[in-house]
UniProtKB/Swiss-Prot annotation:
One of its GO terms (biological process) is positive regulation of DNA-templated transcription. One of its GO terms (cellular component) is cytoplasm. PROSITE patterns: HTH_MERR_2 (PS50937). It contains a N-terminal DNA binding region and a C-terminal metal binding region. Transmembrane segments: none annotated. One of its GO terms (molecular function) is copper ion binding. This is HTH-type transcriptional regulator CueR. It is found in: Cytoplasm. Keywords: Activator, Copper, Cytoplasm, DNA-binding, Metal-binding, Transcription, Transcription regulation. CDD domains: HTH_CueR. Its main location: cytoplasm. It comes from Yersinia pestis.
Length: 139
């Protein structure tokens, strides 16, 4: 299979496939006599794993670990589960952080009159100005 066939089968761009090869995340494809890359079903599996792992938030280094587990016939599913649950915990923390940011922004917006005046509690609070009418804590 050539790179455009692999791109179609995996949902990745040719550029992304070459990037993953450059980062040594996939098994290097064999080169044909004319220098073109030749891919196998194993490459499709590796690249599909990479695409889907990236879609759910795994970093490139975490993907490297998942690929090592994928290639290890003696792997333990407990290792894969542990990596997955660790990623879930990171995502939950990120969600909590985003919710706190959202609540702070809503509180700032509530204090702002939103009129034609120049005084803006949002700007004052974000800038840490002491003359802000906002009593919201700075973070």
């Amino acid at each position: 299979m050539n790179i455009s066939d692999v791109a179609k089968k995996t949902g990745l761009t040719s550029k992304a496939i070459r990037f993953y090869e450059e980062k040594k995340l996939v098994t290097p494809p064999v080169r044909t006599d004319n220098g073109y890359r030749s891919y196998t079903a194993k490459h499709i599996e590796e690249l599909t794993l990479l695409r889907q792992a990236r879609q759910v938030g795994f970093t490139l280094d975490e993907c490297r670990e998942l690929l090592a587990l994928f290639h290890n016939p003696a792997r333990h599913s407990a290792d894969v589960k542990a990596a997955t649950l660790l990623k879930v915990a990171e995502i939950e923390q990120h969600i909590n952080d985003l919710n706190q940011m959202r609540m702070r922004l809503l509180a700032l917006a509530e204090e702002c009159p939103g009129d034609e005046g120049a005084d803006c509690p949002i700007i004052n609070s974000l800038a840490g100005c002491c003359h802000s009418s906002s009593s919201l804590p700075l973070k």
